[in-house]
Amino acid sequence: MANNFSQLAKKSRNELSSSKVKKEVIENPPLEIFKLGNDVLRTNAKRIGKVDLDTRNLAKDMLKSMYSAKGIGLAAPQVGISKELLVIDINFEDSAAEPLILINPEITAFGNTLNSYEEGCLSIPGVYLNVVRPSTIKLRFSDEMGRPRKMNADGLLARCIQHEVDHLRGVLFVDRVTSKEDLKTELKKEGFQMKDVFPISQS
């Protein structure tokens, strides 16, 4: 599942400061993660025109904040920045595994096989519900040096990428939950409200 991911990540090793982030929980992470109900989570992110040091430093701060929250993916809108930038690391426990940094990501193809799997979100802490998504995808993006890349992903990595790309379109995983009763129960339990959910068609 992670072969393609690992190859791409290794190409960035020793090149950039943004991937050199220790996988640890720090007391005061650099970025605040905004929660369900904040308007910034519902805006369309803007493409990044030039990948520069500021972009790489933002990715570095996003990784620090993601690791501190014990997450495996984070999108720039979640930290209040409406830019098309994602950081992903599905191997938090493996200190040698490199994170994946996706700039201006675009999913170019979805596989035909769908599966249901429990998802959570750093912007909706404590809420975990099943979401149906394609099990495989094809993706193109720019890496943190601004170089164009393509990759295939499946399993957890494919799901995580789809989840984070949704954030760039103002979509949250709770919008895709089909069991509204379960959703209402889980949101209420964690202090969130149904009025902040915008259901989308699964067809």
From Swiss-Prot:
The record's active-site residues are: E164
InterPro entries associated with the record: Peptide_deformylase (IPR023635), Peptide_deformylase_sf (IPR036821)
Please name the CDD domains in this protein's record: Pep_deformylase (cd00487)
Q: Which UniProt keywords apply?
A: Hydrolase, Iron, Metal-binding, Protein biosynthesis
Catalysis: reaction(s): N-terminal N-formyl-L-methionyl-[peptide] + H2O = N-terminal L-methionyl-[peptide] + formate
Chloroplast as UniProt keyword: no
The kind of enzyme this is, by top-level EC class, is hydrolase
Instruction: Mention one GO molecular function.
Output: peptide deformylase activity
Q: Does the keyword Protein biosynthesis apply?
A: yes
Q: State where Fe cation binds.
A: C121, H163, H167
Q: Which domain of life is it from?
A: Bacteria
Gene Ontology BP, a term:
co-translational protein modification
* Assigned EC number: 3.5.1.88
Supply the Pfam families for this chain: Pep_deformylase
| Known cofactor(s) | Fe(2+)
Q: How is the cofactor bound?
A: Binds 1 Fe(2+) ion.
What does the similarity note say? Belongs to the polypeptide deformylase family.
What is this protein for, i.e. what is its function?
Removes the formyl group from the N-terminal Met of newly synthesized proteins. Requires at least a dipeptide for an efficient rate of reaction. N-terminal L-methionine is a prerequisite for activity but the enzyme has broad specificity at other positions.
Stated name of the protein: Peptide deformylase
Which organism is this entry from? Prochlorococcus marinus (strain MIT 9515)
Gene symbol? def
